[in-house]
């Protein structure tokens, strides 16, 4: 492999993608963050959050997806198997390590200027993480910050995976978002 056309990450996976981007030697052409959790939370608070988040995700497995609507904005039957599998596979140690390495209360890592200009930080206007958008905009002033009007956390990729994939292909091919009816002007 000599290059990556796109690095895409969602939710808490944004931390992992950002770590990859700051360390990889491979050229990356475009980056798309969908509802990235760019919260900056102190270590003690993250430690307190760990058992609660662990139980919430495990409950998806124990309830066969019945708690999905309480945890996420939707309970679409098509996504339940993924969340059930995640709940089944999750260990407390993995959850603790993930939170130890994520959402840290420290400055955002810098990106090369050229890559920053080809990076999209998308947020749904209805998602809780929208509140982090302003701090991300300050850290990466040359990036694009599209808002999906009326959408919740990761709603487009969950409710229309094929449409989301077409949008990402468009980003790869043209370096911009296509016209989308819910894209805030």
List each model region and its residues.
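Conserved alpha/beta-hydrolase catalytic His-Asp/Glu region
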Residues: 60-113
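Conserved serine/cysteine hydrolase catalytic core
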Residues: 100-138, 156-157
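Flexible "cap/lid" loop of the alpha/beta hydrolase fold
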Residues: 22-58
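Gly/Ala-rich beta-loop-alpha elbow adjacent to hydrolase catalytic centers
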Residues: 8-13, 17
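Conserved acidic catalytic loop of the alpha/beta-hydrolase fold
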Residues: 1-5
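Alpha/beta-hydrolase-fold serine-hydrolase catalytic core, especially in secreted/extracellular enzymes
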Residues: 176-185
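Catalytic histidine neighborhood in serine/cysteine hydrolases
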Residues: 140-154
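Catalytic histidine-centered segment of alpha/beta-hydrolase-like enzymes
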Residues: 151-165
């Amino acid at each position: 492999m000599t290059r990556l056309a796109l690095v895409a990450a969602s939710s808490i996976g944004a931390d992992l993608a950002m770590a990859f981007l700051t360390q990889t030697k491979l050229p990356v052409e475009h980056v798309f963050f969908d509802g990235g959790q760019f919260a900056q939370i102190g270590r003690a608070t993250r430690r307190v959050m760990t058992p609660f988040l662990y139980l919430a995700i495990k409950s998806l497995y124990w309830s066969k997806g019945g708690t999905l609507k309480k945890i996420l904005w939707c309970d679409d039957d098509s996504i339940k198997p993924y969340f059930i599998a995640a709940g089944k596979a999750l260990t407390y140690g993995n959850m603790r390590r993930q939170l130890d390495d994520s959402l840290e209360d420290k400055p955002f890592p810098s990106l090369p200027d050229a890559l920053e200009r080809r990076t999209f930080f998308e947020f749904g206007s209805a998602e809780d993480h929208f509140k982090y958008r302003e701090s991300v905009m300050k850290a990466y002033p040359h990036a694009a910050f599209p808002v999906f009007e009326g959408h919740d956390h990761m709603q487009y990729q969950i409710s229309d995976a094929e449409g989301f994939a077409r949008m990402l292909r468009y980003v790869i091919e043209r370096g911009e978002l296509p016209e989308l009816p819910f894209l805030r002007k």
